Protein backbone atom coordinates (compact mmCIF):
# COMPACT_ATOMS: atom_id res chain seq x y z
CA UNK A 1 0.00 0.00 0.00
CA UNK A 2 2.95 2.30 -0.58
CA UNK A 3 1.78 5.83 -1.22
CA UNK A 4 -1.78 5.20 -0.11
CA UNK A 5 -3.25 6.49 3.12
CA UNK A 6 -3.83 3.90 5.84
CA UNK A 7 -6.21 6.53 7.24
CA UNK A 8 -8.74 5.46 4.62
CA UNK A 9 -8.44 1.72 5.03
CA UNK A 10 -7.45 0.75 8.57
CA UNK A 11 -9.95 3.14 10.03
CA UNK A 12 -13.07 2.77 7.94
CA UNK A 13 -15.15 5.95 7.90
CA UNK A 14 -18.92 5.93 7.67
CA UNK A 15 -20.47 6.92 4.36
CA UNK A 16 -22.04 10.35 4.71
CA UNK A 17 -25.55 9.37 3.68
CA UNK A 18 -28.83 10.36 5.30
CA UNK A 19 -29.40 6.98 6.95
CA UNK A 20 -26.19 7.27 8.96
CA UNK A 21 -26.08 11.03 9.41
CA UNK A 22 -27.93 10.99 12.74
CA UNK A 23 -25.61 8.35 14.20
CA UNK A 24 -22.55 10.26 13.07
CA UNK A 25 -23.93 13.44 14.67
CA UNK A 26 -24.50 11.59 17.95
CA UNK A 27 -20.92 10.31 18.00
CA UNK A 28 -19.45 13.73 17.29
CA UNK A 29 -21.60 15.26 20.05
CA UNK A 30 -20.43 12.55 22.45
CA UNK A 31 -16.79 13.35 21.66
CA UNK A 32 -17.37 17.05 22.39
CA UNK A 33 -18.94 16.21 25.75
CA UNK A 34 -16.05 13.94 26.73
CA UNK A 35 -13.39 16.44 25.57
CA UNK A 36 -15.01 19.24 27.59
CA UNK A 37 -15.23 17.05 30.68
CA UNK A 38 -11.60 15.95 30.38
CA UNK A 39 -9.90 19.24 29.52
CA UNK A 40 -12.39 21.99 30.36
CA UNK A 41 -15.07 23.79 28.38
CA UNK A 42 -12.96 26.56 26.84
CA UNK A 43 -11.90 25.57 23.29
CA UNK A 44 -9.11 28.18 23.35
CA UNK A 45 -7.51 26.37 26.29
CA UNK A 46 -8.47 22.83 25.26
CA UNK A 47 -7.07 21.87 21.81
CA UNK A 48 -8.87 18.51 21.83
CA UNK A 49 -12.23 20.20 22.40
CA UNK A 50 -11.42 22.76 19.72
CA UNK A 51 -10.67 19.98 17.23
CA UNK A 52 -13.85 18.08 18.13
CA UNK A 53 -15.97 21.21 17.65
CA UNK A 54 -14.34 21.85 14.26
CA UNK A 55 -15.04 18.26 13.18
CA UNK A 56 -18.67 18.61 14.21
CA UNK A 57 -19.05 21.89 12.33
CA UNK A 58 -17.43 20.37 9.25
CA UNK A 59 -20.04 17.59 9.42
CA UNK A 60 -22.81 20.25 9.66
CA UNK A 61 -23.83 19.43 13.23
CA UNK A 62 -26.10 22.32 14.36
CA UNK A 63 -24.33 24.91 16.52
CA UNK A 64 -26.97 24.60 19.27
CA UNK A 65 -26.22 20.88 19.61
CA UNK A 66 -22.49 21.56 19.75
CA UNK A 67 -22.86 24.24 22.42
CA UNK A 68 -25.17 22.12 24.60
CA UNK A 69 -22.70 19.22 24.45
CA UNK A 70 -19.85 21.53 25.43
CA UNK A 71 -21.85 22.84 28.41
CA UNK A 72 -22.90 19.35 29.52
CA UNK A 73 -19.30 18.19 29.44
CA UNK A 74 -17.95 21.20 31.32
CA UNK A 75 -20.70 21.06 33.94
CA UNK A 76 -22.31 24.35 32.90
CA UNK A 77 -25.49 22.35 32.22
CA UNK A 78 -26.83 19.19 33.83
CA UNK A 79 -27.48 15.98 31.95
CA UNK A 80 -24.08 14.71 30.87
CA UNK A 81 -23.68 10.93 30.76
CA UNK A 82 -20.83 9.03 32.39
CA UNK A 83 -19.01 8.01 29.19
CA UNK A 84 -16.10 5.58 29.23
CA UNK A 85 -13.90 4.20 26.46
CA UNK A 86 -13.91 0.41 26.07
CA UNK A 87 -11.84 -1.54 23.52
CA UNK A 88 -13.02 -4.88 22.16
CA UNK A 89 -10.81 -7.24 20.17
CA UNK A 90 -11.49 -10.00 17.71
CA UNK A 91 -11.15 -11.39 14.22
CA UNK A 92 -13.19 -10.80 11.11
CA UNK A 93 -13.46 -13.05 8.04
CA UNK A 94 -10.13 -14.29 6.60
CA UNK A 95 -8.34 -13.82 9.91
CA UNK A 96 -8.38 -10.02 9.81
CA UNK A 97 -7.56 -8.62 13.27
CA UNK A 98 -9.97 -5.98 14.54
CA UNK A 99 -9.98 -3.44 17.36
CA UNK A 100 -13.40 -1.97 18.14
CA UNK A 101 -13.35 1.27 20.12
CA UNK A 102 -16.53 2.11 22.03
CA UNK A 103 -17.53 5.20 23.96
CA UNK A 104 -20.42 4.08 26.13
CA UNK A 105 -22.37 4.65 29.32
CA UNK A 106 -23.40 0.97 29.41
CA UNK A 107 -20.68 -1.67 29.02
CA UNK A 108 -23.16 -4.56 28.85
CA UNK A 109 -25.08 -2.99 25.97
CA UNK A 110 -21.88 -2.20 24.08
CA UNK A 111 -20.53 -5.74 24.52
CA UNK A 112 -23.81 -7.26 23.34
CA UNK A 113 -23.95 -5.02 20.26
CA UNK A 114 -20.35 -5.80 19.30
CA UNK A 115 -20.71 -9.55 19.87
CA UNK A 116 -23.94 -9.70 17.84
CA UNK A 117 -22.47 -7.78 14.89
CA UNK A 118 -19.35 -9.95 14.89
CA UNK A 119 -21.25 -13.25 15.11
CA UNK A 120 -23.73 -12.36 12.36
CA UNK A 121 -21.02 -11.25 9.93
CA UNK A 122 -18.41 -13.98 10.09
CA UNK A 123 -16.33 -12.57 12.93
CA UNK A 124 -15.66 -13.59 16.50
CA UNK A 125 -14.94 -11.62 19.64
CA UNK A 126 -11.66 -12.43 21.36
CA UNK A 127 -10.23 -12.07 24.83
CA UNK A 128 -8.53 -8.86 25.95
CA UNK A 129 -5.01 -8.86 24.49
CA UNK A 130 -5.80 -11.35 21.72
CA UNK A 131 -5.07 -8.87 18.92
CA UNK A 132 -4.10 -5.59 20.62
CA UNK A 133 -0.42 -6.59 20.56
CA UNK A 134 -0.50 -6.33 16.76
CA UNK A 135 -1.39 -2.63 16.85
CA UNK A 136 0.39 0.51 18.02
CA UNK A 137 -1.36 3.78 18.76
CA UNK A 138 -0.29 6.69 16.56
CA UNK A 139 -1.14 10.38 16.58
CA UNK A 140 -2.24 11.91 13.28
CA UNK A 141 -2.42 15.50 12.10
CA UNK A 142 -3.79 16.24 8.63
CA UNK A 143 -3.02 19.36 6.57
CA UNK A 144 -4.48 20.35 3.19
CA UNK A 145 -1.61 20.54 0.69
CA UNK A 146 -2.56 23.68 -1.19
CA UNK A 147 0.71 25.42 -2.08
CA UNK A 148 2.61 23.76 0.77
CA UNK A 149 5.58 21.46 0.23
CA UNK A 150 6.64 18.54 2.38
CA UNK A 151 9.65 20.61 3.48
CA UNK A 152 7.34 23.41 4.67
CA UNK A 153 5.58 20.93 6.94
CA UNK A 154 8.79 19.29 8.17
CA UNK A 155 10.37 22.61 9.11
CA UNK A 156 7.27 23.56 11.10
CA UNK A 157 6.81 20.33 13.04
CA UNK A 158 10.21 18.64 13.42
CA UNK A 159 10.91 20.11 16.86
CA UNK A 160 7.35 19.40 18.07
CA UNK A 161 7.68 15.61 18.02
CA UNK A 162 6.61 14.76 14.47
CA UNK A 163 7.86 11.38 13.25
CA UNK A 164 6.87 11.26 9.57
CA UNK A 165 5.19 13.40 6.93
CA UNK A 166 3.33 11.39 4.29
CA UNK A 167 1.97 12.78 1.02
CA UNK A 168 -1.56 11.42 0.58
CA UNK A 169 -2.54 13.24 -2.57
CA UNK A 170 -4.60 16.24 -1.47
CA UNK A 171 -3.31 16.19 2.11
CA UNK A 172 -0.16 15.74 4.16
CA UNK A 173 -0.46 13.25 7.00
CA UNK A 174 1.87 13.90 9.94
CA UNK A 175 2.42 11.02 12.36
CA UNK A 176 3.60 11.42 15.94
CA UNK A 177 3.17 9.95 19.40
CA UNK A 178 -0.47 10.44 20.54
CA UNK A 179 0.67 12.74 23.34
CA UNK A 180 2.49 14.99 20.86
CA UNK A 181 -0.61 15.78 18.76
CA UNK A 182 -1.33 19.09 20.59
CA UNK A 183 2.32 20.22 20.23
CA UNK A 184 2.39 19.37 16.50
CA UNK A 185 -0.93 21.15 16.01
CA UNK A 186 0.33 24.24 17.85
CA UNK A 187 3.58 24.26 15.83
CA UNK A 188 1.58 24.27 12.59
CA UNK A 189 -0.70 27.06 13.81
CA UNK A 190 2.38 29.08 14.84
CA UNK A 191 3.70 28.66 11.28
CA UNK A 192 0.36 29.91 9.86
CA UNK A 193 -0.43 26.45 8.50
CA UNK A 194 -4.09 25.48 8.87
CA UNK A 195 -4.77 22.11 10.49
CA UNK A 196 -7.46 20.13 8.67
CA UNK A 197 -7.94 17.34 11.21
CA UNK A 198 -6.32 15.57 14.15
CA UNK A 199 -6.92 12.06 15.39
CA UNK A 200 -5.34 8.95 16.82
CA UNK A 201 -5.08 5.74 14.84
CA UNK A 202 -4.10 2.17 15.59
CA UNK A 203 -1.61 0.86 13.02
CA UNK A 204 -0.92 -2.81 12.55
CA UNK A 205 2.58 -4.28 12.59
CA UNK A 206 1.46 -7.22 10.42
CA UNK A 207 -1.13 -6.79 7.68
CA UNK A 208 -3.41 -9.20 5.81
CA UNK A 209 -3.70 -8.54 2.05
CA UNK A 210 -7.25 -8.95 0.76
CA UNK A 211 -8.93 -9.20 -2.60
CA UNK A 212 -12.04 -7.11 -3.27
CA UNK A 213 -14.64 -9.77 -2.34
CA UNK A 214 -12.95 -10.45 1.00
CA UNK A 215 -12.59 -6.72 1.67
CA UNK A 216 -16.32 -6.29 1.08
CA UNK A 217 -17.00 -8.82 3.85
CA UNK A 218 -14.87 -6.79 6.26
CA UNK A 219 -16.60 -3.55 5.31
CA UNK A 220 -20.02 -5.20 5.83
CA UNK A 221 -18.88 -6.24 9.30
CA UNK A 222 -17.59 -2.73 10.03
CA UNK A 223 -20.91 -1.25 8.91
CA UNK A 224 -22.77 -3.65 11.21
CA UNK A 225 -20.51 -2.70 14.13
CA UNK A 226 -20.92 1.01 13.47
CA UNK A 227 -24.70 0.65 13.50
CA UNK A 228 -24.26 0.60 17.29
CA UNK A 229 -24.36 4.05 18.84
CA UNK A 230 -21.61 2.94 21.23
CA UNK A 231 -19.04 2.08 18.53
CA UNK A 232 -16.81 5.05 17.72
CA UNK A 233 -14.05 3.56 15.55
CA UNK A 234 -13.06 0.24 14.02
CA UNK A 235 -9.42 -0.53 13.22
CA UNK A 236 -8.23 -3.51 11.16
CA UNK A 237 -5.00 -4.95 9.79
CA UNK A 238 -6.32 -5.51 6.27
CA UNK A 239 -4.08 -4.35 3.44
CA UNK A 240 -5.73 -3.24 0.20
CA UNK A 241 -3.75 -2.76 -3.01
CA UNK A 242 -4.38 0.15 -5.37
CA UNK A 243 -6.14 -2.27 -7.73
CA UNK A 244 -8.48 -3.52 -5.01
CA UNK A 245 -9.23 0.03 -3.86
CA UNK A 246 -10.07 0.98 -7.44
CA UNK A 247 -12.43 -2.00 -7.76
CA UNK A 248 -14.12 -1.16 -4.45
CA UNK A 249 -14.51 2.43 -5.59
CA UNK A 250 -16.71 1.22 -8.44
CA UNK A 251 -19.24 -0.38 -6.05
Curated annotation (Swiss-Prot):
GO terms for molecular function: DNA binding. Its main location: cytoplasm. One of its GO terms (cellular component) is cytosol. The keyword DNA-binding applies. Pfam families: TACO1_YebC_N, Transcrip_reg. Residues 1-21 are annotated as: Disordered. Keywords: Cytoplasm, DNA-binding, Transcription, Transcription regulation. InterPro entries: Integrase-like_N, TACO1_YebC-like_2nd/3rd_dom, TACO1_YebC_N, Transcrip_reg_TACO1-like, Transcrip_reg_TACO1-like_dom3, YebC-like. GO terms for biological process: regulation of DNA-templated transcription. It is found in: Cytoplasm. Disulfide bonds: none annotated. NCBIfam families: PRK00110.1, PRK12378.1, YebC/PmpR family DNA-binding transcriptional regulator. Belongs to the TACO1 family. This is Probable transcriptional regulatory protein cauri_1421.
